[in-house]
UniProtKB/Swiss-Prot annotation:
InterPro entries per the UniProt record, alphabetical: Mt_escape_2_C, Nucleotide-bd_a/b_plait_sf, P-loop_NTPase, RBD_domain_sf, RRM_dom, Yme2_C, Yme2_RRM
Gene: yme2
Name of protein: Mitochondrial escape protein 2
Alphabetical list of CDD domains matching this protein: RRM_Yme2p_like
GO BP annotation list: mitochondrial genome maintenance; mRNA processing
Length: 864
């Protein structure tokens, strides 16, 4: 710097900040000097009206001796600027705007710990260093003005957000503002000032031609200005300056990028134009210097001139984005839903697939842990050697598996073949389907997935169904609770745009996501075992899966078609997913079901495939006896009770014959025998429980949605109880009066409810049997109850009488129609005789039914 500047800087001896310019200080040092001061000064001197104001030409000797004599900002003067919004100029006073003296993007350095809502003027009161750049802008301004320029600086108004300051000065008579501006610019060219926060740019100065607006609003400078054209007089209209005029007015402040005028057909007033600079600092200079400037008439401003009103214009307004979003909900809401779905797929799907793999591999399960497995094996060996204990069979199922070894071998053979079809294990409840598949056939399979449809179907509501389906395959995280919230959002969106936005996913879509992620995990489990040096390394993934059916995981779908309805989304999605697994050679799929109509839903998924089916029935009496004896022997060996004597078990064969070969009933009897009951007592308990269940579910039930009637159920019970072979011909049942209308539907529903079972030959229904072997004894017990039997027989007779009366009514109506003819044609004679015979037969039936009904009523009145 020049000598004058050095003299001034060294005039204050005790000031540690005078040796170097505050503009060249680092941010940390500047902030430290500003905010670590002891206390704010108790008094400020207002330059306006102050006798100690100075000139830069010849400063008085005492100018820098006392800090109180420095011209500085006062809170009162700033309050007046913010209240009036303008800087008043008197005669011989001018105004300059100096740019790039405050860091616009580093205001936190100057504001310190102050809240953003407090004005900068409050910050100045808290700083005890008036010579610093942050507290006294005049210390910066004095380096801008050359020493030989005789001007008196009256006031400095900082514009922190814009990075500059207004300088109000007093000039001598005969000195023009343009001369002062030129002198300052020449001085800055010779002695450029580069602030510490932006050392690559210099401080710039321009004369203020308009009347700037001083405000403390939160308006961020931008390179784009909105220039509005206001009339110079209230009785006049503002002229619309040309592009050339605007260019000549604003080009001096910096490089212009574009000038965009208001469309000529626009009705918006006042008229405006957009002036865009190459950099924001040029726009800051232009706004502060040209705001309030009046274009003269000779320059195209009209008779009274055109005044400019300038504001910053953001290229993309947040309000514009908000307005567009609110005005286009049909586009925005579905787009947001799609974006959320895309983020979910991108972020969560790999995580969910990983957890499903963990579930399939079962690396966290105790039974799959190699270390614990080895320890368990060694302990088992020690027990065998030391105590002579053989492996126990707590349920005594060894006899059952020996009898069904052929089915187990057949199933294992199918799992090594490359056939794209389902494997169905069908059998009544309690026939041991799950144990046969999981404990025997798949005992040594490493990867298997078990899906229990009963748990999913019994869940209440879509949210619970989704959570249970996800839990069975390890699909997590699952935000099933979000579905309810999303449904409300969808409902609100439907009210706004008329259609659903897609925020909430239906049960169909959620299940599809779960099963699709499971399929991806199953495929990954197989392919993860591939190695580069395998002999099949040259095969593609699809070819590898097809070539190694023995490596595929096994998906077991238990309780298939449990509580199924005509249109069930759960079973529909499961069958579609299972068909995809088998078709893509990803996994073997085994269905375990008690429903005899399983072929119908499965054929929709694989219409051109023949399913491989294993039907599990009741075991033979010999196998049942061995099962019970093995169960009791194992209990005696592992427990404290002695084995039962032969005399105690003398009625075992007859009891097993009553129970048949149903595993669950045999096991229940074995448990009751272990508890101390005799075989006959255990069987009687089973019969009593089954009797109560049948009465509650089929006879005394008030369910109006059942597809059968109480009369139909009781008719079947009586006929099966009195049958010598324990079965009825299927067609004989359909020919009875109670089953003529909806006979097949009722029989299928009763079979589904497991009251009866229908045996087929070559796919055609042949015989009707009790649903369980023990049900034959139950049916006999029910028919032996005279009161119950009489009441239900009376209901059957009442229904038959009603049916015959309806038939007679139809016959009489037709006879009445034929009798109304003027002549009786000879051809109608046979028809009339047939109708009369029908009426006669129906009336005879009614008479017989009424006789039987009277007898039953008499029995009921007597109470036995």
């Amino acid at each position: 710097m020049d000598d004058g500047g050095n003299d001034v800087d060294s005039a204050e001896d005790g000031d540690p900040c005078d040796a170097s310019c505050p503009l060249l200080m680092s941010p940390s040092k500047l902030a430290s000097n500003c905010f670590n001061s002891a206390s704010a000064r108790s008094s400020r001197v207002n330059v306006r009206g102050c006798d100690t104001s100075f000139r830069w030409g010849r400063p008085p000797p005492s100018l820098f001796a006392a800090k109180s004599s420095l011209a500085r900002l006062s809170s009162a003067s700033h309050a007046s600027y913010l209240e009036t919004g303008h800087i008043d100029l008197k005669k011989n006073e001018g105004l300059l705007f100096i740019n790039n003296i405050f860091p616009r993007k580093l205001q936190w350095v100057l504001e310190g710990s102050l809240r953003a809502s407090r004005p900068y003027e409050e910050a100045l009161k808290r700083i005890d260093r008036p010579h610093l750049a942050a507290s006294d802008p005049l210390r910066i301004i004095r380096r801008v003005f050359p020493h030989e320029l005789e001007v008196e600086i009256k006031e400095v108004v900082p514009r922190f957000r814009e990075g500059g300051a207004f300088v109000k000065y007093t000039r001598n008579e005969g000195v023009k503002d343009t001369d002062i501006e030129t002198a300052v610019k020449d001085h800055l060219e010779k002695h450029p000032i580069r602030p510490w926060f932006n050392p690559f740019q210099q401080v710039k100065v321009a004369s203020v031609l308009g009347r700037p607006w001083i405000e403390d609003l939160y308006r961020i400078p931008s390179p784009r200005l909105r220039v509005e054209f206001l009339p110079g007089s209230a009785n006049d209209l503002a002229n619309d300056p040309t592009t050339e005029s605007l260019y000549s007015l604003f080009r001096s402040y910096g490089k212009l990028r574009d000038i965009e005028r208001q469309p000529s057909d626009s009705k918006i007033l006042p008229r405006y134009a957009y002036v865009e600079f190459a950099r924001p600092k040029f726009a800051v200079m232009a706004k502060n210097c040209m705001h309030g400037f009046t274009i003269a008439e000779k320059e195209g401003g009209g008779k009274f001139g055109t005044r400019l009103k300038i504001n910053y214009e953001r290229k993309i307004k947040l309000s514009m984005i908000k307005d567009w979003i609110l005005s286009h909900p049909r586009i925005v809401i579905p787009a947001v839903a799609a974006l959320i779905a895309a983020i979910t797929v991108t972020v969560f799907d790999p995580i969910r697939t990983f957890f499903i793999k963990m579930k399939i591999k079962a690396t966290l399960h105790v039974e799959e842990n190699s270390v614990l497995g080895w320890i368990r094996k060694q302990v088992s060996k020690a027990n065998i050697i030391g105590l002579g204990v053989v492996a126990s069979d707590p349920r005594g199922l060894t006899a059952i598996w020996e009898d069904r070894q052929g089915d187990i071998s057949q199933l294992q053979s199918w799992l090594t073949e490359n056939t794209e079809t389902f494997i169905i294990i069908h059998g009544p409840r309690g026939s041991g389907k799950r144990e046969l598949v999981l404990d025997q056939a798949l005992e040594n399979y490493k990867y298997k997935v078990v899906i229990d449809c009963k748990q999913i179907q019994d869940a209440r509501g879509d949210t619970a169904k989704i959570a249970r389906a996800a839990g069975q395959v390890g699909y997590r995280p699952v935000f099933s609770w979000m579905n309810s919230i999303s449904s409300f959002i969808d409902l609100a969106a439907q009210g706004m745009i008329g259609t659903k936005a897609g925020f909430s996913e239906t049960l169909d879509a959620q299940l599809s996501n779960i099963w699709q992620s499971t399929a991806t995990a199953l495929k990954g489990v197989i392919l993860d075992s591939r190695k580069k040096n395998d002999k099949d390394a040259h095969l593609t993934d699809e070819e590898y899966l097809e070539a190694h059916p023995e490596l595929r995981p096994v998906v077991v779908i238990d309780n298939f078609l449990h509580n199924a309805s005509e249109d069930n989304v759960v079973y529909e999605k499961i069958t579609e997913w299972a068909a995809g697994l088998t078709s893509a050679n990803i996994a073997h799929v085994i269905f375990l079901t008690t429903d005899v109509s399983f072929a119908k839903p499965l054929s929709k998924a694989l219409p051109n495939s023949v399913f491989r089916t294993i039907s599990l029935g009741d075991c033979s009496l010999e196998v049942g006896r061995r099962f019970v004896l093995n169960h009791l022997a194992d209990e005696a060996r592992t427990g404290d009770k002695p084995p039962r004597s032969e005399e105690y078990l003398e009625d075992l064969d007859s009891c097993i014959e009553i129970l048949g070969g149903r595993v669950t009933d045999l096991e229940f009897m074995a448990h009751r025998i272990e508890a101390g009951e005799t075989p006959n007592g255990a069987v009687n308990r089973i019969i009593e429980q089954s009797t109560s269940e049948i009465l509650k579910m089929f006879i005394l039930s008030t369910n109006t949605e059942a597809q059968w009637s109480h009369e139909q159920v009781w008719h079947l019970i009586k006929m099966l109880a009195n049958s010598k072979e324990g079965s009825l011909p299927y067609n004989q049942v359909l020919l009875s009066d109670l089953f003529k209308e909806n006979g097949e539907v009722a029989l299928q529903a009763l079979e589904q409810a497991e009251l009866i079972s229908v045996s087929s030959i070559n796919g055609c229904p042949e015989t009707v049997k009790p649903g369980k072997p023990v049900y034959r004894a139950v049916f006999k017990k029910l028919t032996e109850n005279k009161t119950l039997s009489s009441r239900l027989d009376l209901e059957i007779l009442s229904r038959l009488i009603s049916k015959e009366n309806k038939s007679i009514g139809k016959y009489e109506e037709e006879l009445r129609l034929l009798g109304s003819l003027p002549k009786q044609p000879r051809e109608l004679t046979s028809r009339i005789q047939w109708l009369l015979q029908k009426v006669y037969n129906s009336q005879n039936k009614i008479s017989r039914y009424e006789t039987e009904s009277a007898f039953l009523q008499m029995i009921l009145r007597r109470g036995h």
